Amino acid sequence: LSRRIDLGTGLVCLGVALGLAAGCDYSRDRVGDVPSGTYRPGMVAPPGSSRTQAQPVAARDSTEKAAILASSIELIQRAALQPGGDNFGLATQKLNQFFEGTPQADYQLDSAARAFLQPQLPPVKLSELETTVWSLRDARHLEDCMMYYGIASRVGGTGDDLVRARRVFDWIVRQIQLVPPGSLGSPQLPQVPARPYDVLLRGMATESEGFWAERSWLFMALCRQLGVDVGLVTYSRGNVVEPLVGRAGRGERGGGGLSAMAKQPKPDIVWLCAALAGGQAYLFDARIGLPIPGPDGQGVATLNQALADPAILERMNLPGQSPYGTSRASLLASPSRIGILMDSSQGFLSPRMKLLQRDLAGKNRTILYRDPSQQRDHFARVLGDRCGEVKLWSIPLYVETELFRNAQFVQSSLQTLRLFSPEFPLIVARIKHLRGDLSGAIQEYVSFRLAENLPLVNDKKKTIPKEIQDGLDIYATNYLALAQLERNSHVQAESMFLRLLELLPQPGSNPHRYNMLRWGAQANLGRIYEAKGDMRRAIAYYGQLDPTMQYHGNLLRARDLVWQEPMAAAPDPLPPAPKVPPGR
């Protein structure tokens, strides 16, 4: 069906860069490692346990079970706002207590899901999906999904699936800016892919051809909470014919023989996101921050429309400036037809999460599980004859695995979240922001922005170093603008974004990663001025250089505005970036 996902250190070239030591905020739990006191007589024995027969246990009544589950959820929700305790360990213990005595058969994959997953996952991963023991990774999955559900339901609002998915996509593009591959790394530690939760915290993602698709993964995760299946669309450009002499010249066995003429399949090209709604696959390109416009530039194009009408993708080209790269012809000529990569996050595949999801209701309602074979069938049904291989996307499972076993991968992840350490006030404000408490978040941002001699959160006798405070000031300014933008307070958002541009030199002129926030501020100012009808200023901000693929989307927006008034005067030049940060 498909190649098995390789979770070894060689996956996708990252293993070459990853290696040695360091601490770890992510707990390195193994299946079967849970806090002491978790097991009680009657529980199903964990894998490898010497106990072969469960002992009877008095069943908990529904009131006691409800209290246990509520306590577990409360511990997880408090963890981010009150860091430093053992909330996840205690929550995991309570999950084991809540499900003790559950029949082992309830933890098993059904036959269709197993048939889909078995060729793609190592046996140890299949075993982990079916374990009866709840682990710290499960508690993390619950935390992630509660965050995603809160955002998706708040932003998506009411309406049909497409309307809600469009709102979520637009929110992501405004709130999560793009940065170039490698820009969040350091000489000591490379940039590594980030899970959606971490992307939300830092407000930065990387999208590039092929490997980097962090904003796309976030779109998948949020749409999952809307009940909308989203996958990455792939296609191929044909095969490569190896020259007769090439292999022999490199000293390879068999060089010059007929095998040297064998055609080698090219790797699939990862294109954009397809969201399934109303029996159609709608196209959203997180790389450029735009849905593909439908016929005559209206609505969102479906895959069927893009395959039928060459003008739809031709409209995405910017001749002489920025080619789009994918055309109707390249899609129709794909030897592998149209493939789909599905989210491989382990939690969404595990029957444990299906059990837990059934017990979540009301304010705790969260989507934790999606049957992988049913999702595969959904894509196959919608794509029809054009459907190629529908399989798991390897990156999500790889990231989750490395975060729990590879110390250097963890350090690479944490270096992008330094200012979100529990010792600084930014993390609490940002969590409130993402949970929709915009008033509370704004109050928190204001309380430490531009503060002097601010003490550490966890040690009032020590003050925050100036370099850290400068970074907190920048992030607070950016997030104040984004919070006001979410409140539709465009005047306040404009003021904060303009102030941010006054503070930040061009990225690259000094080592601070937060200087890249200039690019997001410029794009958002373009959106604000477009909404106000100030098209000349909107065009000016859309035209500002941005080294990511978002620049292509910004130029498309600018082009559409120019076409509305082709004889209008050129925009006035914008103020230059400061050479050095002015005093804050």
Give residue ranges: language-model regions.
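Hydrophobic/aromatic-rich core segments of domains that either
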Residues: 145, 149, 153-158, 164-174, ...
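Bacterial signal peptide processing site
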Residues: 25-28
